Amino acid sequence: TLCNQMVNFLGIMQNEWASAQSFAHFDTLLVPFIHQDKLSFKMVSDCLESFIYGINIPSRWGTQAPFSQITLDWNVPQEFINKKAIVAGCECDFTYGDCQKEMKILHDALFEVINKGDISGRGFQFPIIALYLNPDFDWMHEEELFKACAKYGTPYFLTKEKQDVEGYFG
């Protein structure tokens, strides 16, 4: 799956480049796959669980897990809303803006996995999660996100409105 390919990519790149390896727009760029394949919440959750566990296992790449980060847009960014979505290198007949429902599925599934922790209930070391805040952020309906904040102190919150953060995370 795409999530397993991302794990392999991060594992390989940690041996080639220094510092954190990051996937910017993690949610925005993944949701077209959910939309196209009509994935259920359970299927999305299983894929993200595989991704999270995969990047926290140091096998194959030496002595440490890949130092990795993902950035979440939470809402489809303006620069993507009217762009045709790309799945498997092909332009789709829908836009990224058509995938906001799938964004909610991805976020709920991701933070459900994060909140469960590992088999012992411990939090995951990676990925470091950064979340872009914007004026459209729904502070009242993000239960899984705020559970993660309370339990593990993740994610980091960033705002594009007050500073230029584009160069920080790829």
Which residue ranges define each predicted feature?
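Conserved catalytic cores of very large enzyme subunits
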Residues: 1-170
